[in-house]
């Protein structure tokens, strides 16, 4: 397992898919055919950026020092109507359990929960069309081709939620890490002070009857965790993935705490988590540290308080030091994991998709929406995502391309809107990196 200083469960990155290759302006010049017509091929598709879930990874550490990723552009079109070669996609491995969000809107883009699952987070631009596509009866030798479409650019937030069948929850220093070290091969840091566990520790529990399940020792909770106090939201995020909660309450009579109040506080924080009501998960109540003198009396009072508040659950007594109750507790946890898995399988009405690759489709308006901003006297800027892409795909090195763009802008109503904003002949108009003089 990584050390506390290297565990990374949340990060921000930028992804830039590859630009499509430019279409080509070319003509056939074969023997006996000096004016053989257009023969410029299309550009190749730009590389997409694809996340791949890999269960060999445990953290988002790979994204800690490298935050910008760029795929290759497609190859330009060629002569003799030959297409340019498509660029290779850029695959980035992430841990299983990674959720991807748009950094600015907070919208969830995808959730990678299976090994090998893929998610296209930035799609490569399509190749521009060569001049073979623009021949008409009027213009049989078009000097026009499209530039490749820009690849998608996104700023993303990656969030790792540990995938564990069983999660150990409770106040700091109730024995969660000790239990994990006893029942698995995990080696968590253990000490008698708050927040020793600053990251989830994960291990596998193997029972004598052949059953197994994964268990996570999660950072300790305190009052107000659902609002971010202490390790707060960082902790609760990881509880989301668990099937069963082992709710550990210390029976140490010397810690000055009331066992039922601790139990109720943790339950309240689980229920208050804004993403999901975590208190609805299957729970086993565990009375920990039963080897400490005076623990029996505190346990008796805890059971009375539970009954008085209508909590009708068995309390499992545990000492990780003497191993009292460990086997029985692990067997019960395995039973509940199996029950939850059976319920999930029954609830799954749709068959599992064979294709594991998902492409996230970002919203694009059906119409080319745009706005006109007056920057200063005689200066205007036009904004609009699709309009800017149209300009970027226009080959401005050829007069035919410029005239075609002008016609499309006029049909879209750009000229009318500029006039309505007070534009006159000779005013400067900007669209992305492109500028032109307005002519009425």
UniProtKB/Swiss-Prot annotation:
Residues 164-338 form the OBG-type G domain. GO terms for cellular component: cytoplasm. The keyword Metal-binding applies. Mg(2+) binds at residues 177, 197. It comes from the Bacteria. An essential GTPase which binds GTP, GDP and possibly (p)ppGpp with moderate affinity, with high nucleotide exchange rates and a fairly low GTP hydrolysis rate. Plays a role in control of the cell cycle, stress response, ribosome biogenesis and in those bacteria that undergo differentiation, in morphogenesis control. This is GTPase Obg. It comes from Lactobacillus delbrueckii subsp. bulgaricus (strain ATCC 11842 / DSM 20081 / BCRC 10696 / JCM 1002 / NBRC 13953 / NCIMB 11778 / NCTC 12712 / WDCM 00102 / Lb 14).
């Amino acid at each position: 397992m990584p050390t506390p200083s290297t565990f990374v469960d949340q990060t921000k990155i930028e992804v830039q898919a590859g630009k499509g290759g430019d279409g080509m302006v070319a003509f056939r010049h074969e023997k006996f055919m000096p004016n053989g017509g257009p023969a410029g091929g299309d550009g190749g598709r730009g590389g997409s950026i694809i996340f791949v879930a890999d269960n060999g990874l445990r953290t988002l550490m790979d994204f800690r020092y490298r935050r910008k990723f760029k795929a290759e552009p497609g190859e330009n079109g060629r002569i003799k109507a030959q297409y340019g070669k498509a660029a290779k996609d850029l695959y980035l491995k992430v841990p299983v359990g990674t959720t991807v969000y748009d950094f600015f809107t907070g919208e969830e883009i995808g959730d990678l929960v299976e090994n090998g699952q893929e998610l296209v987070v930035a799609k490569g631009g399509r190749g521009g069309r060569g001049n073979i596509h623009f021949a008409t009866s009027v213009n049989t030798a078009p000097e026009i081709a499209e530039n490749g479409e820009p690849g998608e650019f996104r700023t993303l937030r990656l969030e790792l939620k540990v995938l564990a069948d069983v999660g150990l929850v409770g106040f700091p220093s109730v024995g969660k890490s000790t239990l994990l070290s006893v029942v698995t091969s995990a080696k968590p840091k253990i000490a008698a002070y708050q927040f020793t566990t600053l990251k989830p520790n994960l291990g596998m529990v193997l029972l004598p009857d052949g059953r197994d399940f994964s268990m996570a020792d999660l950072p300790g909770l305190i009052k107000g965790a659902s609002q971010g106090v202490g390790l707060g939201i960082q902790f609760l995020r990881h509880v989301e993935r668990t099937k069963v909660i082992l709710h550990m309450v210390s029976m140490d009579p010397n810690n000055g705490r009331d066992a039922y109040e601790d139990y109720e506080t943790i339950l309240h924080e689980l229920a208050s988590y804004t993403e999901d009501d975590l208190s609805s998960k299957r729970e086993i109540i565990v009375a920990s540290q039963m080897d400490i003198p005076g623990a029996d009396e505190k346990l008796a009072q805890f059971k009375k308080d539970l009954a008085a508040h209508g909590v009708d659950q068995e309390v499992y007594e545990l000492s990780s030091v003497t191993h009292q109750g460990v086997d029985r507790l692990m067997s019960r946890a395995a039973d509940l994991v199996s029950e939850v898995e059976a319920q999930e399988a029954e609830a799954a009405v749709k068959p599992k998709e064979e294709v594991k690759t998902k492409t996230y489709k970002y919203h694009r308006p059906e119409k080319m929406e745009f706005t006109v901003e007056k920057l200063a006297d005689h200066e205007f800027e036009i904004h609009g995502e699709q309009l800017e892409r149209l300009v970027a795909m226009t080959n401005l090195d050829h007069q035919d391309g410029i005239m075609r763009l002008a016609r499309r802008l006029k049909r879209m109503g750009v000229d009318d809107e500029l006039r309505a904003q007070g534009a006159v002949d000779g005013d400067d108009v900007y669209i992305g990196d492109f500028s032109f003089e307005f002519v009425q």
